[in-house]
Amino acid sequence: MTPLVGVDEAGKGPVVGSMFVAAVRAPTEALPDGIDDSKRLTDDRREALADRLRDADRIDVAVVECQPADIDDANMNDLTVAAHAAALDGVAASGETVLCDAGDVDAGRFADRVAAAATLDVSVAAEHGADGSDDLVGAASIIAKSARERHVEQLSEQYGAVGSGYPSDPTTKAFLREAFEQEGGFPPCVRTSWSTCERIRAEAEQTDLDGF
């Protein structure tokens, strides 16, 4: 059965900032041309499509934000399932079919867990790479990525250059080291349970020991 709702996340891996899960409900003919996995789109194209998706009368959009404190306090797999369920609950109707981009190595298990966590009686399927193969999931990936990028821009305005937020980003690592050196800890926008933060703490402790 053709899905009526697509769900995807953005920002699962970064050490800085929130994760966002978006759900999009629409008849496929209502979706604008050019929908694709958000990672394949230029920033300008992604934002133009996100604006059209948010503004269209026949398209319903829901976004769930998982803040760093929530991520630090929870199991990431459990939180991802709960956020997908909350997002689809925001737009779906009972009896409808939902397709998620699988957030687990076992796509079937992920679908079953999301269905169990949802308050609505919906049929949930999950596929790896669905953001590139299904237009509704692609639309959800665009909305989620747009929300994440706007969030990172706001963090940069508040804290200065934070980079992309990913652990491999030199700007992000420099931001984390400087914040820890100056404050003795990390600001609320940081996922302090990430191994990147643990390494920075360990480096600082070793530096202190070397000073004796």
UniProtKB/Swiss-Prot annotation:
Residues in domain RNase H type-2? 2-206
InterPro entries in the cross-refs: RNase_H2_suA (IPR004649), RNase_HII/HIII (IPR001352), RNase_HII/HIII_dom (IPR024567), RNase_HII_arc (IPR020787), RNase_HII_hlx-loop-hlx_cap_dom (IPR023160), RNaseH-like_sf (IPR012337), RNaseH_sf (IPR036397)
- Catalysed reaction, written as an equation: Endonucleolytic cleavage to 5'-phosphomonoester
Which residues make up the binding site for a divalent metal cation? D8, E9, D101
Q: Give the subcellular location.
A: Cytoplasm
Cofactor(s) of this protein: Mn(2+); Mg(2+)
Pull one GO CC term from this UniProt entry.
ribonuclease H2 complex
The GO annotation for biological process reads:
DNA replication, removal of RNA primer; mismatch repair
Which keywords has UniProt assigned to this entry?
Cytoplasm, Endonuclease, Hydrolase, Manganese, Metal-binding, Nuclease
Q: Name one Pfam family in it.
A: RNase_HII
Q: How is the cofactor bound?
A: Manganese or magnesium. Binds 1 divalent metal ion per monomer in the absence of substrate. May bind a second metal ion after substrate binding.
Entry's Gene Ontology molecular function annotations = manganese ion binding; RNA binding; RNA-DNA hybrid ribonuclease activity
Kindly give the PANTHER family that the UniProt entry links to this protein.
Answer: RIBONUCLEASE (PTHR10954:SF23), RIBONUCLEASE H2 SUBUNIT A (PTHR10954)
Query: Family per UniProt?
Result: Belongs to the RNase HII family.
Q: Its biological function? A: Endonuclease that specifically degrades the RNA of RNA-DNA hybrids.
In Swiss-Prot or TrEMBL terms, this protein is called Ribonuclease HII
Q: Which species?
A: Natronomonas pharaonis (strain ATCC 35678 / DSM 2160 / CIP 103997 / JCM 8858 / NBRC 14720 / NCIMB 2260 / Gabara) (Halobacterium pharaonis)
Its encoding gene is what? rnhB
